Amino acid sequence: RMGGFPIVALGNFDECSSYQIVEGIYNSVITRDITKRHNITNFDLFNRVVKYVIENVGKTFSANAIVKFMKGEGRTLSVETVYNYLEWLEKAFVIYRCQRYDMQGKTVLKTQEKFYLADASLKYCMLGFNPKSIAAMLENIVYFELRRKGYDVYIGKNAAKEIDFVAVRRNERLYVQVCRNFPEASEREVANLLEIKDHYPKYVVTLDELAGGNINGVKIVHLVDFLLAADY
């Protein structure tokens, strides 16, 4: 919940102090690296877009969806402005874009992307802790671990089914589903992977301490074991 910024992770701060530090980092990046550099005058509107993205970590959405949401709040902005905001947030390393990959057509899609946060503490600092957000933040952790290991990471679209992550590194590939509690989601998570007709590794990563083993070639692993694995 307090994230991995070095000053916080290596320090001995309570939760309140940690979030104050994270808030300072966020405000510094937003103020110095984005709003001033790009001459953003409506800071409140920009900040609301940022919060929308943070609220929807791990969910697919489009620039049009943000425009419609803002319209519902009585605010007006263009799709082009949203694209600019997202691009600037990426360049400031606040968010990271994860595109969808059509596994049948073998093409990268340009719509309904997901975004992940550079550090989980940004979500909890700005929005507070909500147990319902744990699953999305698990995805956030797995996404960055795959990136750290050198994979290009995509959302998998296999006909009408979604695979949380398709990770590609040179001639290697693996498929990953992420779920908080394995027994509750096991049928859907495993079934989606079993529909992929190739022999690349397939994983379900979970926080369930009792989960483990192999279901028809799909490996069930705890998050900690997945993070500590030298390779897959």
Language-model region placement:
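Structured loops at beta-to-helix junctions and adjacent beta-edge loops in soluble globular domains
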Residues: 98, 118-120, 179, 205-208
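Short conserved micro-motifs at the rims of enzyme active sites and ligand-binding pockets
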Residues: 127-129, 188, 214-215, 232
